């Protein structure tokens, strides 16, 4: 028998362990018998034999056989090893069966190490045809149709069970639980036989079933929570017992400890003493309580183990969701699960609703019967006497009233008798009312049992629950009395359930209070969010509308009328305007923080502060603090709107009254659709991307603060200094420059007053640091500090005043200048032939004016910088270069923005709008600007769909690669010829083909057939729809051909496929695998290849640019 190296190592290790375990024996035996076998099996061999044997083992180790990376077994003829990926070493080879099992388990299709996809090819039977016979194909289609039909029938059955049957029965169980008689149930059922009511009952039943499920989940969670509390409590008690026992043992005298040891040494005495102690322990009430607690704990542990065992069994079974709902597996399982759910719902509703309601009905019935039986005779007698007295009084009053009426009929109605008549009439009416009331009360008392049965369902249910609670306490009291009669003491802790309840009451109270606190916190946070994000922006929007209403030529009556007609739209518009203004203020404050010295705006909250958490402030701060903050925000924002919006608008109206009121209406067809899209999708993103507004505004703010701060002597206070930062970092800054603008870091409102510049006076610092002898120097110092503080406040006020005047002029100019310039440029657009004299819109005028003004300023600044640096030749080269870029980009942009959208809009109008709206005997009128607007929308949607990562049937991946290349090139490196050849020209040709081919067929070919003019007009009208139908038919035929071929391959695989063959790394796949691929897959491969070529071109171009 050969011994492998591992076996030899194990043997030698075992022998070594034996030697170590018995050192004396092994040493003696080795010394006495030297010829005894040593642990090494080669130790007693001849050296030559030993050398040969060792070399043979080394050769076997080197020529180790290849094994599978999964099962670690070698390959054989039936199951050879393969190397399907680029891995090497011990994980190179694998069995095909092992790999298939692992792939089915991990749902992977590639190697986890080298990420190489595994390649398989189908293996068919020997008699498998390349094309199925017609009969087999029809049989396969019939089997596939049967499977699909079976799936849909199973799906409809499952949905009807879980969404219709179970909810309907559950809801009717709920209804029948409140029914008092069989007749009432019959009337209730007959009144709910309609489709609408049945569907409504199904919906209510579904909600009820979901509520029951959530209640079960909540009960389970509470059970686990209380179990966890008991475990923690038991652990704490055990720790306390251990601590007490340790302390008692530490305090125990040494003699008692010795006696205990002696008692342990004497077995008989210890046994007698243990018996006596056991009798005493059994008589101790605390030990009896502990024994009952142990028994209760054992019982609860058994119950919990039973439920946990069921949970473990459920977890071990791991039933899939499809099988659980009944989509897979036998139908009997679906019926069983449905009946289980129905039974659980029925039991829950029976225990929670039916039993308490029935008990409440029984109790109320007997209580009303006892009440009627006890008070019936007395009440009847009193009612009889009262009825008799009222009848006599009524007769008397009627007689007196008749007599008085006869007396007053002779013309004395205005005297005393007339007044007496009126009084008697009133008394008679009151008497009749009292008689009626008494009769009603009599009827109620007589039918008290019926009235008791007509109480509300909630009252009856509450009475039933109170009776159940009474029965529970009565049972516990009887059990306590019985045990007390047997001589057991009455302790609350005797009953494990009561002990648990008593122990859990403080915890439940704390949890309830915590839940209520969390609930109130949530209500407070929700209320504050509604105020700060809903009401406050709405108020800002309305205040902005009030301050700018004259700019648009409107009055507040128009706004109120719009609010009354459409309150939701009006509120939404004003809220959006208010929230945009608040965002603008926040952005401006963030720009100020980036320019000013840190600490200047300490009184404003910084959203970028890592320690600032607005939600934490909402939770922690009290309500009165939030109310004060909201009122302060209202005052601040209201004042800012007046100073920065209302006054600039009034100044702009005074400066240029001819341009007001502004017209931003969207009723014009030109601006009805594309206005918001051009403004928010094209213009504003282009401005943000290319004009760098944030950098420009920060530079302007820095220049303004530098100039105004120098004029007011506040430069060191307002702006940060780089040398101060460097000095602080290095620790060796100039002390004079550091002390020149010291800012005392104090908190609260005093920080602004304390941030005063300190003069370069070393004596002042010595006076503050040292001990002074006279009080006059203190007074001079205080007077100087007061003077500096006063001057600082005055300069800050002047700074704010100058800032407000600057913003006032800037906002007025921002309204007047772009609108005037934009109107002048926009007036040239109606001259174009496609516009048909559209009127000017001030939204477009403002955007065009802003573009023109910004372009002029940027070009002038760029030219001035090059002229100052004496680089006129470079400037001319840049001008020439940018003129070429602008011309090239303008041509491409004009084709993309104007020509292509017009073609798309015309095609859409000829396909959809003209056949639907224009009669056959009329000629359509095309509005090109409307077609351009529609085409621009469709072009935008198509480009967004192309740039999405998801695969769509109407989107080609090659277009995504082309658009990404254009995005990578940018505006300055755009390759015009490539864009024209690869993007613009294919789109234009396809659109022209779609427009011209139907026109040629309808106007040139079809009239040659000799049909009447009406028929030719109808053909022309529906020519584009007909061509579209033919194109869709061809596309559907191609897709159906691919689908039938895939269906044929699937049927052939089901019938003749016997397995799959795993290919080795680098081995070519079988030819029939490529033949079985669909044309769509081939097209996808071509597209992927093109995209890869484009990506390679992008990488090569970037590398060349980096080298250059």
From Swiss-Prot:
Alphabetical list of SUPFAM superfamilies matching this protein: RING/U-box
Membrane topology qualifier: Multi-pass membrane protein
Region (Disordered): 1-60, 237-273, 762-784
Zinc finger (RING-CH-type): 60-121
E.C. number(s) listed in UniProt: 2.3.2.27
GO MF annotation list: ubiquitin-protein transferase activity; zinc ion binding
One Pfam match: MARCHF6_C
Keyword terms of this UniProt record: Coiled coil, Membrane, Metal-binding, Transferase, Transit peptide, Transmembrane, Transmembrane helix, Ubl conjugation pathway, Zinc, Zinc-finger
InterPro entries: MARCHF6-like_C (IPR056521), Znf_RING (IPR001841), Znf_RING-CH (IPR011016), Znf_RING/FYVE/PHD (IPR013083)
Keyword Zinc-finger: yes
UniProt catalytic activity: S-ubiquitinyl-[E2 ubiquitin-conjugating enzyme]-L-cysteine + [acceptor protein]-L-lysine = [E2 ubiquitin-conjugating enzyme]-L-cysteine + N(6)-ubiquitinyl-[acceptor protein]-L-lysine
Phenotype of null mutants: Semiglossy stem. Elevated drought tolerance and reduced transpiration rate. Elevated amounts of 18-carbon-length cutin monomers and shift in the cuticular wax profile toward the very-long-chain free fatty acids tetracosanoic acid (C24) and hexacosanoic acid (C26).
UniProt protein name: Probable E3 ubiquitin ligase SUD1
Gene that encodes the chain: SUD1
């Amino acid at each position: 028998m050969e011994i492998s190296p591992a076996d030899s190592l194990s043997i030698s290790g075992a022998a070594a362990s034996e030697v170590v375990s018995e050192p004396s024996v092994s040493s003696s035996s080795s010394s006495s018998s030297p010829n005894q076998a040593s642990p090494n099996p080669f130790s007693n061999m001849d050296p030559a034999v030993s050398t040969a044997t060792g070399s043979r083992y080394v050769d076997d180790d080197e020529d180790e056989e290849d094994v599978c990376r999964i099962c670690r077994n070698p390959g054989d003829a039936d199951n050879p090893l393969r190397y399907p990926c680029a891995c090497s070493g011990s994980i190179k080879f694998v069995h095909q069966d092992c790999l298939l099992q692992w792939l089915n388990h991990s749902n992977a299709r590639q190697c986890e190490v080298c990420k190489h996809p595994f390649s398989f090819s189908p293996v068919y039977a020997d008699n498998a045809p390349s094309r199925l016979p017609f009969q087999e194909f029809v049989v396969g289609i019939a089997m596939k149709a049967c499977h699909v039909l079976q799936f849909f029938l199973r799906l409809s059955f499952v949905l009807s069970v879980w969404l219709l049957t179970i909810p309907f029965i559950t809801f009717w169980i709920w209804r029948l639980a409140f029914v008092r008689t069989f007749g009432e149930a019959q009337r209730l059922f007959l009144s709910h036989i309609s489709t609408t009511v049945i569907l409504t009952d199904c919906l209510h039943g579904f909600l009820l079933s979901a509520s029951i499920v959530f209640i079960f989940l909540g009960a389970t969670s509470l059970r686990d929570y209380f179990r966890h509390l008991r475990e923690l409590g038991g652990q704490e008690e055990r720790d306390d017992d251990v601590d007490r026992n340790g302390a008692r043992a530490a305090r125990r005298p040494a003699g008692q400890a010795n006696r205990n040891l002696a008692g342990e040494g004497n077995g008989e005495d210890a046994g007698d003493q243990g018996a006596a102690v056991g009798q005493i322990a059994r008589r101790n009430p605390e030990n009896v309580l502990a024994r009952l607690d142990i028994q209760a704990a054992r019982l609860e542990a058994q119950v919990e183990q039973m439920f946990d065992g069921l949970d473990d069994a459920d977890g071990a079974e791991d039933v899939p969701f499809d099988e659980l709902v009944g989509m897979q597996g036998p139908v009997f399982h679906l019926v069983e699960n449905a009946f289980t759910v129905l039974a659980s719902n029925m039991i829950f509703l029976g225990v929670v609703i039916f039993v308490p309601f029935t008990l409440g009905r029984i109790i109320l019935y007997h209580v009303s019967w006892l009440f009627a039986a006890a008070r019936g005779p007395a009440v009847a007698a009193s009612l009889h006497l009262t009825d008799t007295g009222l009848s006599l009084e009524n007769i008397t009053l009627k007689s007196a009233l008749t007599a008085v009426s006869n007396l007053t009929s002779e013309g004395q109605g205005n005297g005393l008798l007339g007044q007496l008549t009126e009084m008697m009439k009133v008394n008679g009416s009151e008497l009749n009312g009292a008689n009626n009331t008494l009769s009603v009360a009599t009827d109620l008392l007589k039918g008290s049992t019926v009235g008791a049965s007509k109480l509300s369902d909630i009252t009856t249910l509450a009475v039933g629950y109170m009776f159940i609670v009474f029965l529970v306490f009565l049972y516990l009291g009887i059990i306590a009395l019985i045990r007390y009669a047997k001589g057991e003491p009455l302790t609350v802790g005797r009953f494990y359930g009561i002990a648990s309840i008593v122990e859990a009451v403080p915890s439940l109270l704390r949890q309830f209070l915590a839940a209520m606190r969390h609930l109130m916190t949530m209500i407070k946070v929700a209320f504050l969010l509604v105020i700060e994000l809903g009401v406050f922006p709405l108020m800002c929007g309305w205040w902005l509308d009030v301050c700018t209403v004259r700019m648009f030529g409107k009055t507040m009556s128009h706004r109120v009328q719009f609010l009354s007609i459409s309150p939701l739209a009006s509120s939404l518009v004003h809220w959006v305007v208010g929230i945009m203004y608040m965002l603008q203020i926040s952005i401006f404050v963030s720009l100020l923080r980036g320019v000013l010295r840190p600490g200047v705006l300490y009184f404003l909250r910084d959203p970028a502060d890592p320690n600032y958490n607005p939600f934490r402030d909402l939770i922690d701060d009290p309500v009165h603090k939030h109310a004060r903050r909201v009122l302060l925000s209202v005052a601040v924002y209201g004042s800012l709107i007046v100073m920065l919006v209302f006054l600039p608008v009034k100044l702009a109206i005074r400066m240029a009254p001819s341009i007001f009121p502004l017209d931003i209406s969207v009723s014009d067809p030109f601006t009805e659709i594309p206005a918001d899209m051009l403004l928010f999708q094209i213009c504003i993103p282009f401005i943000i991307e290319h004009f760098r507004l944030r950098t420009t505004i920060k530079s302007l703010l820095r220049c303004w603060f530098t100039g105004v701060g120098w004029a007011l002597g506040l430069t060191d206070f307002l702006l940060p200094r780089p040398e101060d930062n460097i000095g602080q970092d290095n620790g060796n800054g100039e002390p004079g420059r550091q002390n020149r603008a010291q800012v005392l870091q104090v908190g609260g409102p005093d920080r602004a007053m304390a941030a005063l510049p300190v003069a370069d006076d070393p004596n002042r610092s010595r006076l503050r640091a040292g001990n002074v002898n006279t009080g006059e120097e203190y007074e001079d110092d205080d007077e100087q500090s007061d003077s500096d503080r006063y001057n600082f406040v005055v300069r800050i006020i002047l700074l704010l005043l100058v800032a407000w005047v600057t913003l006032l002029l800037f906002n007025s100019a921002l309204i007047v200048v772009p609108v005037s310039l934009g109107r002048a440029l926009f007036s040239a657009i109606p001259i174009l032939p496609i516009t048909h004299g559209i009127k000017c819109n001030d939204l477009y005028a403002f955007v065009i004016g802003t573009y023109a003004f910004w372009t002029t300023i940027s070009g002038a600044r760029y030219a001035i910088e090059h002229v100052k640096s004496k680089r006129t030749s470079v400037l001319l080269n840049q001008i020439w270069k940018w003129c070429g870029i602008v011309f090239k980009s303008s041509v491409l942009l004009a084709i993309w923005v104007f020509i292509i959208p017009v073609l798309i809009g015309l095609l859409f109008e000829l396909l959809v709008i003209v056949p639907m709206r224009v009669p056959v005997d009329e000629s359509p009128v095309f509005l090109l600007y409307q077609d351009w607007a529609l085409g621009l929308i469709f072009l935008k949607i198509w480009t967004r769909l192309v740039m999405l990562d998801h695969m769509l049937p109407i989107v080609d991946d090659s277009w995504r690669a082309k658009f990404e290349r254009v995005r990578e090139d940018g505006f300055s490196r755009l390759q015009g010829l490539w864009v024209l050849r690869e993007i613009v020209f294919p789109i234009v040709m396809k659109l022209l083909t779609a427009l011209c081919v139907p026109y040629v067929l309808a106007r040139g070919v079809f009239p040659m057939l000799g049909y009447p003019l009406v028929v030719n007009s109808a053909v022309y009208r529906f020519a584009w729809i007909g061509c579209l139908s033919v194109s869709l038919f061809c596309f559907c035929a191609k897709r159906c051909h691919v689908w039938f071929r895939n269906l044929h391959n699937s049927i052939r695989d089901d019938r003749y496929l016997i397995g799959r063959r795993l290919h080795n790394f680098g081995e070519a796949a079988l030819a029939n695998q490529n033949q079985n691929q669909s044309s769509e897959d081939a097209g996808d491969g071509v597209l992927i290849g093109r995209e890869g070529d484009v990506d390679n071109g992008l990488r090569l171009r970037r590398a060349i640019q980096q080298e250059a």
